[in-house]
């Protein structure tokens, strides 16, 4: 499957669909999810059915569904540059 063959809107809807499937797997209702993350049912509907919503709501939903670990596969963290790491360690020693 070519991921670039789909529109941004199609990907947003797919993300909402996958999040809704995860919610069902956790045996959590939409009402429970909304209450747990502090958003209204229209907001949950827009997120799960249409793929529209703020990133902060997406992160809160992933946390509520105990799925934040899946975020690592969504966007991989950048590799650590050993030279920069040493430089930061030296600064901590100098400042500390």
Q: For the regions a protein language model found, what residue spans apply to each?
A:
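Short, basic-rich loop-to-helix N-cap that marks the start of a DNA-contacting helix
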Residues: 50-63
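Helix-turn-helix DNA-binding elements, focusing on the entry/boundary residues of the two helices
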Residues: 19, 30, 41, 55-58
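A short, Lys/Arg-rich alpha-helix, primarily the initiator
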Residues: 1-25, 74
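Short acidic/histidine-centered micro-motifs embedded in hydrophobic/aromatic stretches
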Residues: 36, 61, 74-78
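Short basic helix-loop element that most often maps to the first helix and adjoining turn
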Residues: 17-33, 91-96
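Short, charged recognition helix plus adjacent turn
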Residues: 72-96
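Short alpha-helical DNA-recognition segment
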Residues: 27-45
